[in-house]
């Protein structure tokens, strides 16, 4: 691995030699599917945040990801390009055969077999409030899945629309505010217009979830 980004040298080079930019984690919020649970793996879409030189994550209280990070102090960010997997991991538990395991610091961490790449993070400086958990992240290990790695990725509005619709769907389920249904439909139309078959299947599943 290449050296750690200069923004994170405050943690000391002895902690990590992983350059997260190599894996597409840049300034802002990078949408990944995070896997946790050393014994019972779980996966859910989570944004990895880089802001003002700080690398951190925010997890909602009560989720499986929140509980596992609070208990174990580790998480794996999976770089995924399948929109259907984002929807499935938001509303359903993934099956055990969908996970693989990688070793870091003598521990075996669950990652997704479909990931193009993965990064194992140690969660430090954890702040647990009534609503959420915030933790700084130290990248411990990372790798590419050569079978899934794509050389060139062109931004696709349909894929991005699925991500936005999924976020609004979770907000609708929490609040019941119908304004989110209008936003979901807006992004569903965009996914249908600009996306491919995977995006359309993802939106179909999302609508099925909302109709339950």
Stretches with model-predicted labels:
Residues 2-118, 122-212:
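Basic, polyanion-binding surface patches
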